[in-house]
């Protein structure tokens, strides 16, 4: 007999609980429970036995396509200690280097796409994504070369530790599910020391897998943790 999976939607200080029906995804079950609420459920913590979602009309988190006009913000975010520690392999965070690195992604001349995260209309961070198979050397290190890879950063330090990480990744998941309807899995590979990032991934439904060494631009390697999300199970 299949294990019963419980879903809880938090809204306005109260919890609404139910169970997943048959082949229903976790997201679909949350939407069903939240049908009468004023807002869409977002993942709060999907790492436990109960899959917990939240409806918070006061926090609107979304993504928009990055433009070259965003690059000064990206350079400022990249220069912040809490970001640069994990993004140093992308080069110096000065504007010229950032423009050289990300400009082609913005222009659409590479397989990578860039997104700006907005919280209540304010730009607060960025996300980049790509199909792993478009970068064969990296894809060989991963369990599913056709997965969609993602990297992300909260740029504004004031938003760190406020629950934005899971909200921005959830917004990315929903958008990417429609952009890549054939993708069975999504993939992220944070540095093994980046415990905050690993925890955020768990909260939105990723599971940790193989540790592997990712070559860096300076000839060294970084030990990362491959994290995979089952699109059908989590999003439907």
Indicate residue ranges for each PLM-predicted region.
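Residue-level detector of secondary-structure transition/capping positions
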Residues: 34-37, 82, 91, 106
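Residues that form generic nucleotide/phosphate-binding pockets
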Residues: 36, 77, 86, 101-105
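Acyl-donor (CoA/ACP) binding surface of acyl/acetyltransferases
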Residues: 1-3, 9-14, 19-22, 26-59, ...
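Residue-level detector of short, conserved catalytic/binding motifs and their immediate flanks
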Residues: 61, 113-115, 148
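Hydrophobic alpha-helical core bundles mediating ligand binding, dimerization, or RNAP-core interactions
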Residues: 74-78, 98, 102, 150, ...
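Active-site rim helix/loop that mediates acceptor-substrate recognition in acyltransferases
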Residues: 91-114, 119
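Helix-loop element at the rim of GNAT/NAT acetyltransferase active sites that forms part
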Residues: 76-93
């Amino acid at each position: 007999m299949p294990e019963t999976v419980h879903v809880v939607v938090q809204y306005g200080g109260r919890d609404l609980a139910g169970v997943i029906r048959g082949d229903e995804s976790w997201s679909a079950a949350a939407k069903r429970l939240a049908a009468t609420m004023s807002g869409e459920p977002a993942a709060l913590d999907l790492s436990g036995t109960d899959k917990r979602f939240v409806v918070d009309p006061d926090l609107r988190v979304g993504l928009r396509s990055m433009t070259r006009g965003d690059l000064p913000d990206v350079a400022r975010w990249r220069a912040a200690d809490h970001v640069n520690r994990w993004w140093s392999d992308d080069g110096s965070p000065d504007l010229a280097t950032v423009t050289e690195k990300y400009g082609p992604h913005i222009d659409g001349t590479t397989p990578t796409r860039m997104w700006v995260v907005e919280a209540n209309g304010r730009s607060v961070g960025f996300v980049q994504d790509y199909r792993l198979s478009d970068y064969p050397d990296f894809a060989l290190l991963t369990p599913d070369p056709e997965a969609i890879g993602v990297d992300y950063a909260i740029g504004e330090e004031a938003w760190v530790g406020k629950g934005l990480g899971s909200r921005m990744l959830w917004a990315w998941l929903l958008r990417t599910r429609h952009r890549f309807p054939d993708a069975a899995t999504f993939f992220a590979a944070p540095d093994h020391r980046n415990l905050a990032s690993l925890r955020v991934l768990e909260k939105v439904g990723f599971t940790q897998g193989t540790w592997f060494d990712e070559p860096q631009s300076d000839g060294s390697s970084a030990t990362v943790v491959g994290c995979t999300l089952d699109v059908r199970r989590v999003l439907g």
